[in-house]
């Protein structure tokens, strides 16, 4: 993220680029991460200050978790989350007014089919005036640049000689790309709905069936992210069993796409990398970069 902008009384001089990662688990900018959740209210929230006010409605950010929607342009949710991410990044820079270009991504195999709709969705209003955390922001949106997700994460890996496989496992999708001698292989691109939420849903269903109680994601997420440690309680053991089954399925899918442990360097990014680290033996074998 560039930092050579000049600001004067909270207003940027010249265009600035702001990167946004619209994940189903979290919204990420260069300096902020928050849960992908939004709840709409007609009146100002009583206890929460973490809200967007836009067109006379109030949207509390990050208290809930969006259900996987398939197409992010089907509702206003990701538009409001974009405003929140934009405000977070401007606030970090000490800005309240700016000309902005968004840099955003799409899953690898969906770039061609969804880019036009995604750009139109984010560009639906070029003159933005809204409030976030009770502070006013004014933005002239100059454009939206769309990139294939995942490639930027391995940009600093150097030449990447030999055979490599990039796997981006987010909350909603899993994308795969082969990179041979530093060259991405177009025909190898694939994206499918097999993100971490698939695993989370199975864990919650199993725990509900066993105990008759809905276990919220916030109690399961730390186990998926960090492993179960020394815990032996029911939640931990069910999480371990289902997460191990999920990572086995991931490895099967990678193998079906041509992955060979002794021949191909595996680069895993996204939240799914935590599961492979804690619930498979790939890391112990040194197979994951």
Model-based region annotation:
Residues 29, 176-178:
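Conserved blade-register residue in beta-propeller folds
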Residues 169-175:
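Ser/Thr-glycine-rich phosphate-binding loops at phosphate-binding pockets of nucleotides
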Residues 1-166, 183-198, 210, 218-289:
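Nucleotide/phosphate-binding catalytic cleft detector across ATP-hydrolyzing
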Residues 172, 181-184:
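Short connector loops/turns at beta-strand edges and beta->alpha or beta->beta junctions
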